Amino acid sequence: MKKAILMMTFGSPEEITFEGVADFFTNIRRGVRPQDHEIQTLYDNYVRIGGTPLQKITRQEVTLVEARLGNEYSVYFANKFSSPFIPDVIGQMEADGIEQCICLILEPHYSFYSVMGYEKFLESKQIQFLVIKDWYQEEALLNYWADEIAKILKEEVKQDSFKVIFSAHSVPIFALDFGDPYIDQIFENSKLVAEKLGLSSEQYTNTWQSESDIGIPWIKPDVLEYLREQTEHPDHYIFVPISFISEHIEVLFDNDVECYDLCQEFGVNYHRPPMPNTDSRLIDALVNTVRVNENQEFKEFLPEEETFDELVPSDETKNILAESEDLQMPEFVKKLIEKKGRENVKMPYLIKKMLEKAGKLPKE
């Protein structure tokens, strides 16, 4: 039986031009082109950081994993929102005769909002898939963060006052309402690293970053809001974007530009440990998580009738959403129902999955 590993990431613009960024942004918005001012802002951010190394770094990570596991698995790489796209790579895998595939998403934590979005592309009548849901507890990855933060504390902070700010990509607040494990995983991940460092609860905190302006509330506190709200600052802030593993715009701009600029304004020293990128400890974590999971059940992913963002649910789904107060239905869903009428509301795919997980909706 021919087996493969499919390493997947979010993607990035294929070229840093206005239209290159527009194409990428349009893919993120599921084919709806953002307004020009939104594209211009994102384009300017890419220009500010000199482009993005994400694709280069990810391909290097793939090569390093292949060097360790290539005798047993064919290793492929795909992006969610840029070339090579996941469906195209799956097509190539089918042509290569692959029958089983371990899906290794290069995001350590599981979220309904993000990771589930990869699963909808896993359509093949030939290939059975095994999706590794999360791998943030891998000891090698925890050691990486602890070691790199410890270097900053020893070499740069020394005896000065400091605070470690663990940040993670925010998610819409309805993810919390419906029991998304992501938030708890981020807190646990931060605590595990802090314990390795011997940090007290006063020496570190959790914040969120990189939320999108799509008209719905996101998990707080935002890292920039957190900084502005502090009445007193330590001598040093150490920013640890723990939900990411590679340098890309949400680290190089959101942290290294926006957080840095605020630190300059407040007279605080800014620090950020290097991202794992191609470090051997990250590769150890990726290889080990494959080993730990490779004997689990593979299954066929059939195409969903609904997509991640466009779902016309059954009347039962709509009724449950409208009538179950204990689900803490997000305000934007209530407003949609009030404005359009229950029969006309399109619910996000992930809300249906959250309802199933909460036992409020039987799996079909």
UniProtKB/Swiss-Prot annotation:
Pfam families linked: Ferrochelatase
GO CC, any one term: cytoplasm
GO terms classed as biological process: heme biosynthetic process
PROSITE patterns assigned to the protein according to its UniProt record, in alphabetical order: FERROCHELATASE (PS00534)
Pathway: Porphyrin-containing compound metabolism; protoheme biosynthesis
Binding residues for Fe(2+): H169, E250
Disulfide bonds: none
Cell location: Cytoplasm
Keyword Ligase found: no
Binding site for Fe-coproporphyrin III: R29, Y118
Molecular function terms from GO: ferrochelatase activity; metal ion binding
E.C. number(s) listed in UniProt: 4.99.1.9
Top-rank taxon: Bacteria
SUPFAM superfamilies, per the entry: Chelatase (SSF53800)
UniProt keyword terms in alphabetical order: Cytoplasm, Heme biosynthesis, Iron, Lyase, Metal-binding, Porphyrin biosynthesis
Catalytically driven reaction(s): Fe-coproporphyrin III + 2 H(+) = coproporphyrin III + Fe(2+)
Protein family (similarity comment): Belongs to the ferrochelatase family.
NCBIfam families: hemH (TIGR00109)
Stated role: Involved in coproporphyrin-dependent heme b biosynthesis. Catalyzes the insertion of ferrous iron into coproporphyrin III to form Fe-coproporphyrin III.
Name assigned to this protein: Coproporphyrin III ferrochelatase
Species assigned in the record: Streptococcus pneumoniae serotype 2 (strain D39 / NCTC 7466)
